């Protein structure tokens, strides 16, 4: 009888254990889906740590190998010449070259192009993450009559090297926008760039589509001016150095290479998120961003693929110039886009079909003193893709 009861208890315990693990795994999967920002922060930190450890091992190995060679050659030289000359090995070493910026007494000329390395660009920025309202920002910059409606500004003492449209995808981040303007607007003025801000706001019930918002922002910005440089800027990324020059170049640029929440490490080589820049010509050549990424994740990886498929490489700032701080979030992030991996596997096939060339939208335009607001209600029907 006791043996029979034991047999009955065993399945019941197994069932309870199975229910417990099912509940735990379901809760974990739900958390990953609805709060991807937290989960992916830890994931990227682990990836970055792995890359750092790997690079350190390589560096240590190279140093040990070099010391062994130096010792061997030193012994040979001392035995032959009875001397201990320093050894000059014929191998390549990479050094971080210090960039020379112009002196304080540099003279500007209104008919000359503004240099890229200006004396006004000092380097580290004093970051203030305290929350403020747009009223405070409006009052702060209202004292500058050179800032025109929509946040348009250009230098008067030299000709801007780049005309830059700053595109900011936006939804329910009202506490972040003034913090970004407090730091970014003065930085761009010190860099002597001609610029304007475009806040592209998504309304409606669909998941956030960051990439499609960038495409909309591009189309609307080009109606205002013949911009030649585009900066795709997350609202919660604050640059820590004004020497991170927001101009474009011969290759697409990834500006935000070291983010504080990832321990200032690049999560993976193909990481292209946060803040990036392309010329108008480059952006059109790659057919813009994909429109098919609804929710968190994947669109930056697809952009990387598009850049590579078009024959470009990605440039990055040297050293600590690409450091950024991330404004803390007070709300849950966007849900995961679970279909991103299937789309990424078909990046090359989709590139000519999904992007600027299949984009449709209806925008409501309003003007703030510091930016042009482009409000759109996005749905998948606005960017349908034919079979590929």
UniProtKB/Swiss-Prot annotation:
- TM segment ranges: 15-35
Taxonomic superkingdom: Eukaryota
Inducing or repressing factors? Up-regulated in subcutaneous adipose tissue during obesity and diabetes.
Q: In which pathway does it act?
A: Protein modification; protein glycosylation; Sphingolipid metabolism
Q: Where does the UniProt entry say this protein principally localizes?
A: Golgi
Could you confirm whether the keyword Zinc-finger appears in this record? no
Q: What is the annotated tissue distribution of the protein whose record heads this document?
A: Ubiquitously expressed.
Q: What keywords is this UniProt entry annotated with?
A: Disulfide bond, Glycoprotein, Glycosyltransferase, Golgi apparatus, Lipid biosynthesis, Lipid metabolism, Manganese, Membrane, Metal-binding, Signal-anchor, Sphingolipid metabolism, Transferase, Transmembrane, Transmembrane helix
Q: Which residues lie on this side of the membrane: Cytoplasmic?
A: 1-14
Cofactor(s), names only, from the UniProt record: Mn(2+)
Q: List the disulfide bonds.
A: 114-158, 229-248
GO molecular function annotation: galactosyltransferase activity; metal ion binding; N-acetyllactosamine synthase activity; UDP-galactose:glucosylceramide beta-1,4-galactosyltransferase activity
Its GO CC terms are: Golgi apparatus; Golgi cisterna membrane; Golgi membrane
Q: Name one GO biological process term.
A: positive regulation of embryonic development
Name the EC number(s). 2.4.1.-, 2.4.1.274
The reaction(s) this protein catalyses? a beta-D-glucosyl-(1<->1')-N-acylsphing-4-enine + UDP-alpha-D-galactose = a beta-D-Gal-(1->4)-beta-D-Glc-(1<->1)-Cer(d18:1(4E)) + UDP + H(+)
Annotated membrane topology is: Single-pass type II membrane protein
Which CDD domains would you find in this protein's record?
A: b4GalT
Q: In its keyword annotation, does this UniProt entry include Transmembrane?
A: yes
In this entry, the parts of the chain located on the Lumenal side of the membrane are 36-388
Q: Which residues bind UDP-alpha-D-galactose per the record?
A: 169-173, 208-210, 235-236, 264, 296, 329-330
Describe its function.
Catalyzes the synthesis of lactosylceramide (LacCer) via the transfer of galactose from UDP-galactose to glucosylceramide (GlcCer). LacCer is the starting point in the biosynthesis of all gangliosides (membrane-bound glycosphingolipids) which play pivotal roles in the CNS including neuronal maturation and axonal and myelin formation. Plays a role in the glycosylation of BMPR1A and regulation of its protein stability. Essential for extraembryonic development during early embryogenesis.
Q: Which family does it belong to?
A: Belongs to the glycosyltransferase 7 family.
Protein name (Swiss-Prot/TrEMBL): Beta-1,4-galactosyltransferase 5
What is the native source organism of this protein? Homo sapiens (Human)
């Amino acid at each position: 009888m006791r043996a029979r009861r034991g047999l009955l208890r065993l399945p019941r315990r197994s069932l309870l254990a199975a229910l417990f693990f099912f509940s735990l795994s379901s809760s974990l999967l739900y958390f990953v889906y609805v709060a991807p920002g937290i989960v992916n922060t830890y994931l990227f930190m682990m990836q970055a740590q792995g890359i750092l450890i790997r690079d350190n091992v390589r560096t240590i190995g190279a140093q040990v190998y070099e010391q062994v060679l130096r010792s061997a050659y030193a012994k040979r030289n001392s035995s032959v010449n009875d001397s201990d000359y320093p050894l000059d090995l014929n191998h390549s070493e990479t050094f971080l070259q210090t960039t020379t910026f112009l002196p304080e007494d540099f003279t500007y000329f209104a008919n000359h192009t503004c240099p890229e390395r200006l004396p006004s660009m000092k380097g580290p920025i004093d970051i203030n993450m305290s929350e403020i309202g747009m009223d405070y920002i409006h009052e702060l910059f209202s004292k500058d009559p050179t800032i025109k409606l929509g946040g348009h500004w250009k230098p008067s003492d030299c000709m801007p090297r780049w005309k830059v449209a700053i595109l900011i995808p936006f939804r329910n981040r009202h506490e972040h926008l003034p913090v970004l303007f407090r730091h970014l607007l003065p930085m761009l003025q010190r860099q002597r760039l001609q610029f304007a801000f475009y806040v592209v706001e998504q309304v409606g019930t669909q998941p956030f589509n960051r990439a499609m918002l960038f495409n909309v922002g591009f189309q609307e910005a080009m109606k205002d001016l013949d911009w030649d440089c585009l900066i795709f800027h997350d609202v919660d990324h604050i640059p820590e150095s004004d020497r991170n020059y927001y101009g474009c170049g011969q290759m697409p640029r990834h500006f935000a290479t070291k983010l504080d929440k990832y321990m200032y490490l690049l999560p993976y080589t193909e990481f292209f998120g946060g803040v990036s820049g392309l010329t108008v010509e480059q952006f059109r050549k790659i057919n813009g961003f994909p429109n098919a990424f609804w929710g968190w994740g994947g669109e930056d990886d697809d952009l990387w693929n598009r850049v590579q498929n078009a024959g470009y490489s990605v440039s990055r700032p040297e050293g600590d110039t690409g450091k950024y701080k991330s404004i803390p979030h007070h709300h849950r992030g966007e849900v995961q886009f679970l279909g991103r991996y299937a789309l990424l596997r078909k990046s090359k096939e989709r590139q000519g079909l999904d992007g600027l060339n299949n984009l449709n939208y209806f925008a409501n335009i309003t003007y703030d003193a510091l930016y042009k607001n482009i409000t759109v209600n996005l749905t998948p029907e606005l960017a349908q893709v034919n079979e590929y």
